[in-house]
């Protein structure tokens, strides 16, 4: 389980709240979320559609501002930062992996991975060398000069993982990283993320609706109606039952109701 002191944790979230204004109606997307995550954890955030999973991930990643509460990354409060400082944090402390890869289509795999290195204050004599090392590590040593359209979905996602690792971030945040992939490619991507966590001791946080993905994670935080309903590692009996139900629903085609936020 994560450390209790935010100075010892790679991530500390304190009483995080987010209100969304929909016309004249105020919706409480997050209602006082508190969370500690230690370095090297491999954890997931699960819950039904509209529970606040992607909202929480966006606030952790500095992509949006909370209504109230704090987010600390490596002991630094990112909620008090201006946009310029946040941009630096996102470049150097946080890696993002999205469902639809978000690679630049006109750039090769090597160029996509090299790009964030070129914008970092951590100067490297040869950004391309670091990019090649990461792509090699992820089994893409023969795909350096391929553009995204020349790669399979699983290969594109591994390029995205390499890009996320480019500046040695404290956190990798993954929003439905296997949501657009078939089961074989999903397994490959999950193996890659697990390898990153084990070999580089990088903290990986995954938002998922997929019960098979959830069952591979070491810790699961369950959100319901914008607050944490459970936080366990390994899976509790209740969560095992929930995963089993999701598997049954997916098998009968009923899992569609759980797709999207």
Where is each model-derived feature located?
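Long, low-complexity, intrinsically disordered segments
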Residues: 255-261
């Amino acid at each position: 389980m994560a450390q209790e002191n935010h100075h010892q944790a790679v991530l500390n979230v304190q009483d995080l709240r987010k209100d969304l204004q929909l016309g004249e109606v105020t919706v409480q997307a997050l209602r006082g979320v508190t969370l500690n995550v230690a370095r090297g954890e491999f954890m997931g955030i699960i819950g039904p559609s509209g529970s606040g999973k992607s909202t929480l991930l966006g606030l952790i990643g500095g992509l949006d501002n909370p209504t109230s509460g704090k987010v600390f990354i490596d002991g630094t409060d990112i909620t008090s930062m201006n946009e310029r400082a946040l941009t630096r944090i996102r470049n150097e402390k946080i890696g993002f992996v999205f469902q639809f890869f978000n690679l630049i289509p006109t750039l090769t795999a090597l160029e996509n991975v090299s790009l964030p290195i070129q914008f970092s204050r951590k100067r490297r004599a040869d950004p391309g060398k670091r990019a090649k090392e990461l792509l090699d590590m992820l089994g893409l040593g023969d795909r350096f000069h391929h553009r995204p359209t020349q790669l399979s979905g699983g290969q594109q996602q591994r390029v995205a993982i390499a890009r996320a690792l480019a500046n040695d971030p404290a956190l990798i945040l993954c929003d439905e990283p296997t949501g657009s992939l078939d089961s074989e490619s999903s397994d490959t991507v999950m193996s890659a993320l697990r390898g990153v966590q084990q070999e580089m001791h990088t903290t990986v946080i995954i938002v998922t609706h997929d019960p098979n993905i959830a069952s591979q994670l070491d810790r699961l935080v369950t959100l319901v109606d914008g607050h944490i309903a459970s936080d366990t590692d390994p899976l509790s009996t209740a969560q095992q039952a929930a995963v089993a139900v999701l598997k049954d629903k997916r098998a009968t085609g009923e899992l569609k109701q759980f797709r999207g936020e």
